[in-house]
Amino acid sequence: MTDAHLLANLCFGRTLQSFQGVILLAERGALVDARALLRSCAESVIAISALKVDSSMPQLLREEHDLHRLKLANALLNGDHALSAEAANDQRLIIKEIKAQYGEKGPRRINWEAKAKDGGTADLYTIAYRQASIDGVHLTLSTLGRYFADGAGDALPSFRFYPDNSNLDSTLFDACSAMLHALGVLTDWFGLPEHHEELRACIEDWKRM
């Protein structure tokens, strides 16, 4: 099994778990959190698609992992943290290890928009990944607006701390789109033609949603 195949399998595990989480949270009316998992689902599918076509993707995933390790180690050492001498030394060793491996240029960050274009998932990036970042993942006015009602007519403005189904349909539709795309890529890439007919039937059902 190649590194790309291994990572694609792991990404599919994350895709599946995030997809299931979207459904469970949407059923409870927790749309903000459901959309946060929609972004996670979309991100994993973008990665799977990029792994199929871009031989540099496994190395980029390693580099982004090391970039996060480097930033955290620097933050712990330079911040106002009560680190023990042993813990501080551990962070210095991480920094030394990564600098020795990558030199002054350091590890690279993944450009997910570019990878989505490479892997044929640009629409998924815009509709699911990017939109869910604005109204689900991050604390923005769009996210906070879900908890407030302006009031209509004589009704007073009020807080809405109760289940939300304002864009339930599109959230589930986009989650299904991401999941079906992942299955399409993997059945083709891993040579699983026995599942093509079942997948086509699922896609037709999705189109009727």
Predicted stretch roles:
Residues M1-M209:
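A cross-kingdom marker of C-terminal helix-rich interaction/assembly modules
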